[in-house]
């Protein structure tokens, strides 16, 4: 047997579910609370700082949210500037008064994380009637946040009441002597005829005298007199009729429908013309008219080329003015703002207004954005969120998502994409029904034989990538500028994806997920790399190496392009699953899967630059609490907490870390009570650390840490430190909870090629020892489990009422406890909770007693509690120099771990639950290797 040694240069390969002999060097079985960094190695994730317990008080205080208050909330993040970084949520409810938006500022004001004031517009809470988080979409556009209720059918705003055949304009086009001008007005079955005969000549004494010349006023005055007296026969005034002279015309109105005819002059009768609601040409209209008078200009060759015009008087009453294009009289004004997306507008620091989106609420109340100002249902249609059927009725659709691209705001509705005018974000109607411009709105549909309800969209250099449950599309323009004339939609790929979880982009890549089953299956993750215009994208199942690693309970996907990772989580679990890459510009040098276990069920995760914000829920029922936390993803902390003698600064690697709210000394029991600014979480293990450079009896206290006892008194919950009076340095006492850095290594095989891809799994290999290179700290442990060894075990029987079970054995690490019910492993946090001192298992639901169901006798639930026995190995650290009383941090250390077992006889974990950082950089193993006398070629 030959003595051999091999080195694993790094552990940046992440988790792999492949068999150990197929794993690449650097891949591991599991990496919990690890964070791969190309510079520092496989580091321990940063600790989460406690910011606030979420309450309903404004700006602070109030009642804590508990039970399931925020379980179905839609969470979002708003980054305005350095003073305004908000985390908010939408709590939908069918009862208007209970629907609400809550927003908290993550930038403290004098140490207080304030809740923003939300001012609601009239009836705006009615829009928040959807109950589930996936029923809402949120988009940030500058200083406003657009909120979309995906279940709200869009309606239209009806036009003002308008009756045709109620107006007529009689226009004198030529003044003739010795001529008859006649007007016939037919109301019901009665025709009223009014005539005026012009004089034969003038009585002027010379050519310069125009006093008695015949003009249009003479004709119009004569006709008007006749009309007002009921016609030539003078029967009396016609009820409901008015007649007004304006310029060279008479305008007649009546409260009932009527028809009108006119003729005048000696040849052809064209010296007097009449029009009511439409004309053939705009030249037929009077140059002076009543303000807002509307007439249709009819194109006899194409109805789509007809348009409407409205008179705009200079004095806004009547007289001289111009004819401008307008909307069909009585036509719908636009989309109802009450049923369209609303906006949350930032009005000041910690102040928002939730309102409808109306550009002209004075003239067009209730109309979303800009009203439809011109055209009709043929020449200027509504966007695709409302569909007009052949019988003229409207079918309401729902807006699934709002997006912003190329200076336009757009909507996704079923298989349609609607985009606003360029530069006019909420104007979805054309400026003119007569002509189309490149700035006009865009409305396109995806053509597919599959159901293609769009629910996601991402911009790329090649165009807009559209996502449906079964197919992906691209919306683009060959010349690069989207316009109604050039925009196209083409199919890209045919991958199934989860319609409730939006895709994300990570720099130049796009990621989306699909599920094999909504509960019992697992989650697949795909990566898409868009190519040039018209080219098929590259799509890769990036989660194949960890197949069935990510549960189907995932409810959200987020990304950090800055840090090149995506993160997935579900509200019923405390884990966040990550996929991180690192590229040198040509290829990905790192493709790494790992997960973080947070101190509560994860309801929200968002990364802003190098800061991660999270909302977690701890406890259940009335003791449940929602907490806002943050973590710094870099090795350089934002605040100075722990400092070594060399000036190295690190944040404590503990969750819920925060300064103790107060510190008091109990002289009777000789201990310090460090009070918590939050309720103690009994399911987590407490820890205290001292910050700064304070001294105690001449010894540097910075970096002092202890696992304290916990207690409560009239002041509140506290952690106690025995035999120390910490009141003099209360400002440096940080409280929090431990979390475990836990990396499970695969079996070691002798690798026969330089790249380490070929393993000799048939050989006999005995691993003598492993030498680990550990960075950033000197606090790390190693746990080993030998094959065939079991720990302490106890069994119990359910009685239908008892939830609490207390084994008689003890355990060093309660994470080693395994609980089974009827042979099935239970999930900690979901099915049960665990506490120490004494060891206690508390089920969420009491295990059932023996019972009879459908005449079948069923046995009582069998409970098995046992220790998954891991032995802590006593490693030896190579000799080194250190400064006495300094913080126990070292940039590089080597640990030698004795093994002396066959490679398939044990499992080894690298473990650390201390509040200090740690990084696994590399490992070399030594052992004896026998190729079983085979000659290999």
Can you describe what each PLM-predicted range is?
Residues 87-92, 147, 410-411, 464-467, ...:
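Conserved beta-strand element within WD40/beta-propeller blades
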Residues 260-268, 322-324, 330-337, 366-369, ...:
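Surface-exposed interaction regions enriched in Ser/Thr/Asp/Glu
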